[in-house]
Regions:
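Alpha-helix-loop-beta-strand connector modules within alpha/beta enzyme cores
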Residues: 176-182
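Proteins enriched for Cys/Gly/acidic motifs involved in redox and nucleic-acid/cofactor modification
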Residues: 1-170
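Active-site/ligand-binding neighborhood in enzyme catalytic cores
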Residues: 173
């Protein structure tokens, strides 16, 4: 992930001139919450609002057309966040649903456990689920990168690692390995 070297991060929205909303769209409630949050920001702030996450694929284009957000970018574009947030013109860049994240996270500020994404997407096509359409097919993160991330985090004092993904049980099916081998 980007180092955010061009931005100063704050948790106080009143101080922010840029707000990035990492949205979820798994449930109707999550979508509603995102739209409600954007409305709250519109009332109380003049900050530029950017939408990323799963909602970029389901609601992003409409929110951009309504001028409720300045920019929309998908999961695969988060690695370019510095350049995206610096754009003056509104944009819609949903990204690539086949992208495999190559970023390595060195730290989790304020956390005692480290979360390691090992897998993304899902090959199941459950009739009630939107995940394959907003996250793409199942794909595994590179084993070397996963182990590198764990090593870096261990050097930063973490001793507990939680392996995460959309469907962790499918880890390795696309790369001819398995969770047990990892």
């Amino acid at each position: 992930m980007s180092s955010m070297k061009d931005f100063e991060i704050t948790e106080n929205e009143e101080e922010a001139d840029t707000i990035v909303i990492n949205s979820c769209t798994v449930t109707n409630g999550a979508d509603t919450h995102v739209r409600s949050y954007i409305s709250q920001i519109e009332k109380n702030s003049s900050a530029k609002v950017f939408l990323t996450g799963c909602g970029a694929h389901t609601k992003g284009e409409k929110l951009l057309e309504e001028k409720r957000v300045h920019g929309v970018f998908g999961q695969s574009e988060k690695e370019n966040i510095d350049a995206l947030l610096a754009q003056d013109q509104p944009f819609y860049n949903p990204g690539d649903l086949n992208h495999v994240d190559t970023s390595v996270v060195d730290d989790f500020i304020g956390k005692s456990r480290a979360f390691i994404k090992i897998q993304e997407g899902c090959n199941f096509r459950c009739s009630y689920c939107i995940i394959p359409f907003v996250r793409g097919d199942a794909r595994s993160m590179d084993e070397t990168r996963i182990l590198e991330q764990i090593s870096r985090l261990a050097l930063n004092g973490f001793g507990e690692f939680i392996l995460t993904g959309t469907n962790v049980g499918s880890y390795g099916q696309d790369t001819k390995t398995s969770l047990a081998k990892l």
